[in-house]
Amino acid sequence: MSRLFQKEDDIVALATPFFSSALCVIRSSGVSAIEKFSTMFSDPSKLLEASGHTIHYGYILDNETKEKLDEVVVCLYRAPKSFTGQDSIEVMAHGSLIGIRRIIDFFLKVGFRMAEPGEFTLRSFLAGKLDLTKAEAINELISAKTRQVHALAVNKLSGSLFDKIDLIKKDILNFLSAISVYLDYETDDNEVVIPVDIILKSKSELERLIDSYDTARKLENGVTLVLAGSVNVGKSSLFNLLLKEDRAIVSSYAGTTRDYIQASFEFDGILFNVFDTAGLRETSDFVEQLGIVRSNSLIKEASLIFYVVDLSGKLTDDDLKFIDAYKEDSRVLFVLNKVDLEQNNQTVEFFNSNDIVSLNTVKISTKTLFGINSLYDRIRSFIAVDYMKTSDYDIVISSTRQAALLKRAYALIIELLSKIEQNISYDMLAFDVYEVVNVLGEITGEVTSDDVLNNMFKNFCLGK
């Protein structure tokens, strides 16, 4: 059996990142956590006699040499009023790397073992302190990279998803109660009125939750934005402008960027993974050729493409090929750069021509910042279509596990409706209803297995 389920063990882990900092938090829990920790605290009797939810100042001591390891503040919790439902100690110490190692070594020396990833949260779940939807929300909250994802995780942590699943489950059980009447009493089938509206409502609620999953995945993965174009048109300048920092080398020499550069930024609460790619051109340089191949591959996979054109120069053959290939692609915005310079008449006339005027374009100058607000407005228009739909949903599903179970429950509901149309016997309908309820119970953790829990919590970070 996995050590995750050895609930009687006293466990310890660093709950904050392992790097030098002003403070760190070392978390411990277990049936003997307070007694064991007291042997390494400067005033053991104070801890042993203390009530829960109290804070104590003192020192971590080597219980053999009495050497002081660190000056600490200790938060003490007594079962069952703690996150794990067990006695727990949280130590706030100085964030010295050597100090952290020495303190944890002493925890191990007095009988604690290192916690497995997610073990504290698992113990909280097993103690009935939270359901699986809240446990997963904690993990989502920790890993959130943008305000939108963070807000969605907080919403689920407050119990919104559990409440929604519980409501659907109660509706389905009400349907079961209604058809149970016909199981208990003989009734003329012609007089039977099955409350199909209850099942249709549940079907609609499940559809809505399942639909929200695609939006959630897009929010978590972010927008893949590729900056493409010929050499020396200002892609790297635009890259730096979007990031608001100098990440890419800007040079008047063509071919400065020979491979892509990747970075991330947040815009209106949405994560953008932006790629500054090698300029598209014919070249004999093998390394640059590889960079161009990668550029073309990124373009094909991109969510959004900014094709940068130099309005002060002539359009290249590569520009014309790209425009012809992507002129009807809604992912592409043609960014007409360098409007601060004397413009090339042929290039300007090309984009003003009737054949090409329908192209999605915006004029900017990365040097003077002309048109940048217009560019930002175009970005907002793009993300409004697929990435700002969270307002359409009261709850958004982002867990692959939850989405898979919701799809199973939905398939069972469809099957149930089909059997109702076929006038299948009530006892068979009751069996199907119980199956739906069990699947919904797997989402919240009311029905689950050790294997499922082990697989889920191993993806948590240490100390959580």
Swiss-Prot record:
UniProt subunit comment: Homodimer. Heterotetramer of two MnmE and two MnmG subunits.
Known role: Exhibits a very high intrinsic GTPase hydrolysis rate. Involved in the addition of a carboxymethylaminomethyl (cmnm) group at the wobble position (U34) of certain tRNAs, forming tRNA-cmnm(5)s(2)U34.
Instruction: Answer whether the UniProt record assigns the keyword Ribonucleoprotein to this protein.
Output: no
Note accompanying the cofactor annotation: Binds 1 potassium ion per subunit.
Binding positions for K(+) per the UniProt entry: S251
Q: What is this protein called?
A: tRNA modification GTPase MnmE
Highest taxon, organism lineage? Bacteria
Source organism? Borrelia recurrentis (strain A1)
Annotated (6S)-5-formyl-5,6,7,8-tetrahydrofolate binding sites: R27, E90, K129, K464
Q: Which residues bind GTP?
A: 232-237, 251-257, 276-279
Q: Does the keyword Electron transport apply?
A: no
Name the keywords, alphabetized: Cytoplasm, GTP-binding, Hydrolase, Magnesium, Metal-binding, Nucleotide-binding, Potassium, tRNA processing
Question: Which residues does Mg(2+) bind?
Answer: S236, T257
Query: Which coenzymes or cofactors are required?
Result: K(+)
Q: What is its EC number?
A: 3.6.-.-
Cysteine pairs bridged by disulfides in the record: none
Domain TrmE-type G residue range list: 222-384
Task: From the UniProt record, report the name of the gene that encodes this protein.
Answer: mnmE
Similarity remark: Belongs to the TRAFAC class TrmE-Era-EngA-EngB-Septin-like GTPase superfamily. TrmE GTPase family.
Q: Name one GO biological process term.
A: tRNA methylation
- What InterPro entries is this protein classified in? G_TrmE, GTP-bd, GTP-bd_TrmE_N, GTPase_MnmE, MnmE_dom2, MnmE_helical, P-loop_NTPase, Small_GTP-bd
The subcellular location is:
Cytoplasm
Which HAMAP family does this entry report, sorted A to Z?
A: GTPase_MnmE (MF_00379)
